[in-house]
């Protein structure tokens, strides 16, 4: 979570200095204020949507298991179900159908199938964890030149499908590497000549492919941009809209709860130098899991991440190096007695932090899940130590080597705190074995963590350099390998691209853990892309995040 320095700001007296020199910041204020505090959940309306979903839900279930439906039509149906965020409702039925179709797969069956249909089939299998071979696309390449046939460039829907398919590639799938570059260029060259829904679909995909987008937002956009696909099955379209309205009410209530909690904590009074970003943080966490059963998990993870913003901005944009050392020591002790050693301005935060974790710990202990709270707390302590190391580097003017930077940078990216805190309220899914797998730092987790660090760095390095803060991965790479700034950025982008391939592979069957545990790992990488692909969307949330918040919580979907 990068910050941008200004020359003016708040100063406060502390025990260490009457007028300390601070790395002051002047963050843009919240664009929302108390807007979401006034929401009132109509429980009867909420219940009506739940009841109204039952009939179309059963109708869609029957469609999914319909044995008379053509396989391509069936996969097209499942694709739409997945795009509107309903896979979790029918996972058993969908996997039963896909198991059968995958086992019957033959490359010869695709010889007479068009590019768009093959792309839809490929995406369905890959999204749901089945490693359909990328050889299904070989027939679209010229056998002599090895390049894609010029004939596919007249099939915009087919090219769009291939471009989306390419985002699901793993290492070694050269044909999809080539497709991604080739098709992106072709789509960019024709997008302004297109009209209607197809134009919007291409623009949406070029801006951010579905696989790298926020699931709830992608579902919402699907209603608008894929009207024909949605309306081909009336029961699915009806269920999807009712489901979205149901989620909207639940999530507005959750946003109200965390907004009130934040206001009650008085952070804007006790630490007024921080970024006020409650809806943005809630959106971030919502991006990890939107399913109704994770309501408590979202509330807990949002609260902990809001604590993290206070800590981050205190270290990065307010505290002196002496205060940072004292605060880090207090974080290591994690005891109320340590409050006397830290500056007065941060004491209310420290007390609330300890109290809230204790309260969450008690609640989870009753469910036999205290270990997830301990993991979250330890990650919080780790990031404080990481922030201290960054501060010491800045204070001494030290630029770390790239390996040294990455070792600490993966901690200070905040990925570890957010991802472990996301596990706290997930329930029985996070078993002792599942948590042990997570703590083993598996490859998909490493990849998502790397994306979190480097995507942030690529977007914010200039800001950080201007404000005189610690060197980013871009600076460390330049120093270590003696390359130009452009070369460093290009190399980091390749690392990000390969990390996506590793995540994709980690989500394919056979998996070490359930997709329920892998989904937040995948989705956190997606949210990093949402926040940092085009700008520092967290510090300056007036663009993408504002658009998304409006889309989900302000501009209601008509039913």
Curated annotation (Swiss-Prot):
The gene is GAS. The keyword Lyase applies. This is Germacrene A synthase. GO terms for molecular function: germacrene-A synthase activity; magnesium ion binding. It is an enzyme of class 4 (lyase). It comes from Tanacetum parthenium. Its EC number is 4.2.3.23. GO terms for biological process: diterpenoid biosynthetic process; sesquiterpene biosynthetic process. Mg(2+) 2 binds at residues 312, 316. The keyword Magnesium applies. It comes from the Eukaryota.
């Amino acid at each position: 979570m990068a910050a941008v320095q200004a020359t003016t700001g708040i100063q406060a007296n502390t025990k260490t200095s009457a007028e300390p020199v601070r790395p002051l910041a002047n963050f843009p204020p919240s664009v929302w204020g108390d807007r979401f505090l006034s929401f009132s959940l109509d429980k009867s309306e909420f219940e009506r949507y739940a009841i109204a979903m039952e009939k179309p839900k059963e109708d869609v279930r029957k469609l999914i298991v319909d044995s008379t439906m053509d396989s391509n039509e069936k996969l097209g149906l499942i694709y739409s179900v997945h795009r509107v965020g309903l896979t979790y409702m029918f996972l058993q039925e969908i996997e039963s159908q896909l198991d059968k179709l995958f086992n019957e797969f033959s490359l010869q069956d695709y010889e007479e199938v068009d590019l768009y249909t093959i792309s839809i089939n490929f995406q369905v299998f890959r999204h749901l964890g089945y490693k359909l071979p990328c050889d299904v696309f070989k027939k679209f390449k010229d056998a002599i030149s090895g390049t894609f046939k010029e004939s596919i460039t007249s099939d915009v829907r087919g090219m769009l499908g291939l471009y989306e398919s390419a985002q699901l590639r793993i290492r070694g799938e050269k044909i999809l590497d080539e497709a991604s570059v080739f098709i992106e260029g072709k789509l960019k060259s024709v997008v302004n000549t297109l009209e209607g829904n197809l134009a919007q679909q291409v623009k949406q995909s070029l801006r951010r492919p579905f696989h790298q987008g926020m699931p709830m937002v992608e579902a919402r956009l699907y209603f608008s941009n894929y009207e024909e696909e949605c309306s081909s099955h009336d029961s699915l379209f009806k269920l999807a809209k009712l489901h979205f309205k149901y989620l909207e009410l639940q999530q507005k209530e959750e946003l109200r709860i965390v907004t009130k909690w934040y206001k009650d904590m008085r952070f804007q009074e006790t630490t007024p130098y921080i970024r006020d970003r409650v809806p943005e943080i809630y959106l971030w966490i919502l991006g990890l899991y939107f399913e109704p059963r994770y309501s408590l998990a979202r509330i807990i993870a949002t609260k902990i991440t809001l604590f993290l913003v206070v800590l981050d901005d205190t270290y990065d944009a307010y505290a002196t190096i002496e205060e940072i050392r004292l605060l880090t020591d207090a974080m290591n002790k994690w005891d109320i007695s340590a409050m006397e050693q830290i500056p007065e301005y941060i004491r209310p935060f420290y007390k609330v932090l300890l109290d809230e974790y204790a309260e969450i710990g008690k609640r989870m202990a009753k469910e036999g899940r205290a270990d997830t709270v301990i993991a979250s707390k330890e990650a919080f302590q780790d990031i404080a130590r990481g922030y201290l190391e960054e501060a010491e580097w800045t204070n001494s003017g030290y630029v770390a080597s790239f390996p040294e930077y990455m070792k600490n940078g993966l901690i200070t990216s905040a990925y570890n705190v957010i991802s472990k805190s996301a596990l706290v309220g997930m329930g029985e899914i996070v078993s002792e074995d599942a948590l042990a797998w997570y703590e083993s730092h598996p490859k998909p987790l490493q990849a998502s963590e790397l994306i979190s660090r480097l995507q942030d760095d690529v977007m914010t390095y200039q800001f950080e350099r201007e404000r005189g803060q610690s060197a980013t991965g871009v600076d460390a790479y330049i120093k270590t390998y003696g390359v130009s700034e452009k070369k460093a950025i290009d190399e980091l982008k390749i690392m990000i691209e390969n990390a996506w391939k590793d995540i994709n592979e980690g989500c394919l069957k056979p998996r070490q853990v359930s997709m329920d545990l892998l989904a937040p790992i995948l989705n956190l990488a997606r949210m990093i892309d949402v926040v940092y692909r085009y700008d520092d969307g967290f510090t300056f949330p007036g663009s993408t995040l504002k658009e998304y918040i409006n889309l989900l919580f302000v501009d209601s979907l008509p039913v």
